[in-house]
Amino acid sequence: MTHQFNPTILREYDIRGIVGDTLTEADAYALGRTYAALGRDEGARRIAVGRDGRTHSGMLESALVRGLTEGGIDAVLIGMGPSPMLYFATHYLDVDGGIQVTGSHNPADYNGFKLLLNGRSVFGAEIQAIGQRSSRGHWSEGNGATEEVDIREAYVNRLVEGFSGKPYRVGWDAGNGAAGPILDMLVDRLPGQHHVIFSEVDGTFPNHHPDPTVEKNLADLKELVEREQLDFGIAFDGDGDRVGAVDGKGRVIWGDQLLMILAAPVLDELPGATIIADVKASQTLFDRIAELGGRPLMWKTGHSLIKSKMKETGAPLAGEMSGHIFFKHRWYGFDDALYAAVRLIEAVSQSGGSLTGIMDSMPKTTATPEMRFEVDEVRKFAIVEEVRDRLSGDGAKVDATDGVRVSTGDGWWLLRASNTQDVLVARAEAADQSGLDRLVAQIDDQLAKSGVKRVEATH
């Protein structure tokens, strides 16, 4: 038996599509069969399976598990929860890998799968290989068993293990995502006062879209912090692997700023350690890590790529602008928004001040948000290469780690191709608005030379 996946769902970091359109129940079954065959090739026998709270996650999970067991893999079902709980399961349980059914932070009609096998994320070429193997029908046969295991208590216990934070007044917004029930358990274990909103799981996301990196999605949290006069607020995305925050004045604390705060206590304990951030992060972050005695490392955007670089370098902490925060220090190295929140409370406690005070003391720069604009899929990487070649010929200071990051006397700008969508991504940062306008004009000038006009993408 063979199965053809819609090629658009085989993404760089996971499998994701629109349910009933590009992603079907048959795809979930075929993924289970193909993953079982790949896993058995590597000696895998037991796989943990979790799901988020989307309306179709249960249906996809059932088909996936049927495929796994018919392929000879035992499935250990941990039920509904955030993606990091599934990642935790791969360390806590006697299993050889894991699959989370999740649409991440995509709109409600999307869903997909995040895959782990033998201690690694399955991404890039390995995801393409799943499609190729499925189309050839190279499936294993067997009769695997299913088992249900409740690890929620163990997961929450591990989240607060060794916690040394002070009692703060904190607002929390779970965005009706899969982290909600775990959050309700977590705040009962933390000192202080906790005001939780939208912890009821609802896959239609009735209150706001669960993406805390978009400021409008933090409006309810800001209002809660202001109304209750809280110290700060914390928000999660739909599957609980990305974190957002606001201070006591309602100011958004972006991913690179969070990493700046979280790095200080880690470097106190591990002087000289490497701290990784993606190419979209502020230069002030890399400068601050160096000031604290750490080794800043700029790396490619993408949570699977960051995890791989952490393993390679032994870095205890990494983060992305998108709110993925990865702790290897006292944790497992995977991105977990709930754990990042716990460590944020600790970091503020250890600073001796308030999160608002920390924000007040941060270097003041002016930056664009992440600018995304649609381009022809076949041209997106070529455009970046053209820009790189022109700038290198002009003697500009260019970092080509991931796209083009150009350093100037008073700032920097970035242009890179998205690995997951037909868009180019740009960002710029300068000392003041006039400098920022000049850098954005440089981006537009380079795009124009490659025949592209910057029009904001709708996705």
Pin down the residues of each PLM region.
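An N-terminal, well-structured beta->alpha segment
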Residues: 1-66, 70-71, 148-168
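N-terminal small/polar loop signature for handling phosphorylated ligands or for N-terminal nucleophile
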Residues: 37, 41, 45-110, 157, ...
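Short glycine-rich phosphate-binding loop at a beta-alpha junction
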Residues: 44-52, 169-171, 273-279, 316
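Glycine-rich phosphate-binding loop
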Residues: 96-110, 225-247, 252, 296-298, ...
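Gly/Ser/Thr-enriched, mixed-charge loops and adjacent short helices
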Residues: 109-228
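Phosphate-binding and adjacent anionic-ligand microenvironments
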Residues: 270-459
